[in-house]
Each structure stands twice: as structure tokens, then as C-alpha cells.
Amino acid sequence: MKRIVILISGRGSNMQAMLKVAAAERWPAQIAAVISNQPNAAGLDVARAAGIATSAINHRDYPDRELFDAALAELVDQHSPDLIVLAGFMRILTPGFVNKYFGRLINIHPSLLPSFPGLHTHQQAIDAGVKVHGATVHFVTAELDHGPIIAQAIVPVLEDDTEDLSLIHISEPTRPY
């Protein structure tokens, strides 16, 4: 059975959806651990309640990205993952970290890449006047939000959408995993 480590920074809504899918009999993987760069991330409580190993490693405790990523890699490696999923992990990873896990590191991004990389994707979609928005699962490369696409899911952008409403449309029924 494949082992997955999930990295989060907040409430873990994508992680929660993965936990639900992982509970299905036919899912060929085990979520081995959830790790957050925010010690008070609400998603850690959700993972603990589901019986999943959790850890927090505060990026503010490290003077630079390289040292943080090295410590994060040590923590990840303790769980011997086959796959590392960035599910709302709000840190840009160093090329060293990305290269270490190349081909095993995927991201869940809240837009239809290559459109709207980076932050505030829902507002970007509304401002651009697009009629559809969505989410992308892609392999992580050193270039932000540019790795090969694995899957995408589409939702309509409604005329009265705000950034918060767009978040709701994209959240549950259209997750691309």
C-alpha cells in the first residue's frame, strides 16, 4: 500500500476530502502523516481525530528557507512516503526540497492552471471575467505552479460570485482527486 504524507498550513479542507476518499475500501493508499508549518493549524486537530500521525514545524523558527526545508524533509522522511501532497501548504519550497522528492511531490492548486498561479486565485478569476474556474492537481517543479498537470476539475463562475463564494463553489463537489 502506498504511503502519503500531507503538508498543510491551515484548516485542511483538501486534506479532509482526502481523508474521506482514503476511508473508501478501494483506495490504494494510506495517509501516513499530516505535517503543518503552522503549529496551530486547525487541520492538525482533524487529522489527529482521524487517528493520523501529526507534526508541526514552525517555519518562523528557521532563519532561512533552506534550513526550514531541510528540517521539513527530515520530518517527512520519518514516514517513508511514496507521495507527498501539498494540500493548502502555503510555503514556497526550495529547489533542493523539490528535487529530493521530484516525481513524488504534488500540489492541489485552486485554479485551472496555467491560469491564475499564486495566491488569490478566485479573485483573479472573477477580475478576469472568466466563465469557469476550478482546481488543478499537478506535479511540483521548481517553478511555482507550473509542473505537469495530473487532473483538473471545473466549476462555473456565477455573475454574483465574490472571492468567498467562489471558494464554496470549488470546495466539495469538484475536487480533482
Outline where the language-model segments fall.
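Mobile beta-alpha loop/short-helix "lid" or hinge segments that flank ligand
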Residues: A42-D45, L93-P95, H138-E159
